[in-house]
Every structure is written in structure tokens, then in C-alpha cells.
UniProtKB/Swiss-Prot annotation:
This is 5'-nucleotidase SurE. Keywords: Cytoplasm, Hydrolase, Metal-binding, Nucleotide-binding. It comes from Afipia carboxidovorans (strain ATCC 49405 / DSM 1227 / KCTC 32145 / OM5) (Oligotropha carboxidovorans). It comes from the Bacteria. PANTHER family: 5'-NUCLEOTIDASE SURE (PTHR30457), 5'_3'-NUCLEOTIDASE SURE (PTHR30457:SF12). GO terms for molecular function: 3'-nucleotidase activity; 5'-nucleotidase activity; exopolyphosphatase activity; metal ion binding; nucleotide binding. Binds 1 divalent metal cation per subunit. InterPro entries: SurE (IPR030048), SurE-like_Pase/nucleotidase (IPR002828), SurE-like_sf (IPR036523). Nucleotidase that shows phosphatase activity on nucleoside 5'-monophosphates. GO terms for cellular component: cytoplasm. NCBIfam families: PRK00346.1-4, surE.
Amino acid sequence: MRVLCTNDDGVNAPGLKVIEEIADQLSDDVWIVAPELDQSGVSHSLSLNDPLRLREIGPRLFAVRGTPTDCVIMGSRHVLGDKQPNLVLSGVNKGRNVAEDVVYSGTIAGALEGTILGLPSFALSQEFGGPQNRDKPMWDVARAFGADVIRKVMSVGVPTDTVININFPACAPEEVKGVVVTRQGKRNQGFLRIDGHYDGRGNPYYWIGFEKFPVPDIPGEGTDLAALEGNYVSVTPLRLDRTDMRFSEQLANLFNTP
């Protein structure tokens, strides 16, 4: 089995080394094509107005000056060429990708691009348990559970329009209570803020920021948020087709002619 790995934190991110370790447990044919720079929050953006620069860093290790989506396309269509991967792994992200994160996440987008290309794809993210731990997430949980979760899902097959989103809780491996299949949650949006500043010429500029102590989430039962709060590994199947079928049926009564 040939595995293609990417991420959104960049080619020098520690989580990329963790995804390589996980991939090495699954295959002896692992390739890495990752962004040269941090691409967190770029979602599924595709570089159409700038050229892509590809740099070979080492054996089966490449950096692309582009997004995670660019990396998966470049890896699949150029680096590997006619030796197509059998599996795409994106991560391990520094920080969870749950609830509305799935819309913004470059990590999930990398896996989604693999799904679009017809490849079984997984996004992996490690919760770090609060701002004070942002620079020291506990990667050991991802190391301990990542490969086994992927093997079990692959044993039943991944639907062609589905990406698997895996999130690891912020605890020691021995504190993990199990692995649960979840649905996408919804969080309190009170954590977002705008930080305003002035440059040396008095012109305003802004950063999108996050509250250090936001209003706590009340996770719904069966959600990815609830799983992580309970020290469970969360496995969420996400569909590429985002059509709201129930509302479509209502709209059909308004617009569709007999």
C-alpha cells in the first residue's frame, strides 16, 4: 500500500513527523508532500493565480509553496505520477478539528481533496487542552491510537464520497476511555474576537483572535465535542456532498413544476 501524507501546519511541523510515524505502521511506501509554510485556516483553497514551487527536501519528502489541497494534487498527479497512492493521511494537526472547524480546516481539506480524487482519506488532529498547552500537545495519544483506528476503518472500506475525521483527546494514552463514532458538533461562537491595532503611520489593522477563557461549550450528546471532553477518540465520517436533502424536498414543492 502506498500512502500520501500532507498537513496544513507546514513541512517542519512536529505533527507531520507524527503522521509519518503512523503511516509507517501501515506501509513501507510512505510519501510526504506538505506546504512549505503554515497554511492553517486556508480551508479547501486552490492556488490558481500563483505558480506552485516544489522542493525535494529528502527521500519521499517534498515541500510545496501552496495549500494542502495543492499538495495532495501535486503529490498525486505529479510527484507519484502513475504510482498512485492507495491512502491519503492529513495531519496530525496541532489542535482539534471539530464542529465548525471542519469548514475552515486545511487539514480536513487535504483529506477531502484525496476523497475528491477517489482515494480513501483521513484527517487526524490532536487536541492540546487549552491555550497554555498550545506549544506542547500530547502527541502520544495520536501515536498510540492512529494506526489502529485507520486499519479498522479501512477493513470495512471508506465510501467514495466520505472523508474520515479523527480527533484525539488531550490526555495520556492510558487515560483514553475508548474510540467512538460521532457526529459533527456545534460550538459557542463567543470565542471569536477582533483585535485592533495601529501601525507606525497611524493606520489601523486587525487580527482575528480568540478569547483565552471563552464561554464554555455545552456539547450535544454523540458529538465530536462531547467525545473529546470525555477523553474518547472521536471518529466522524464527513460527506463531500453537502446537500440538505430534507430542505431540498421542501423547496421542491415551491419551485419544481409538475
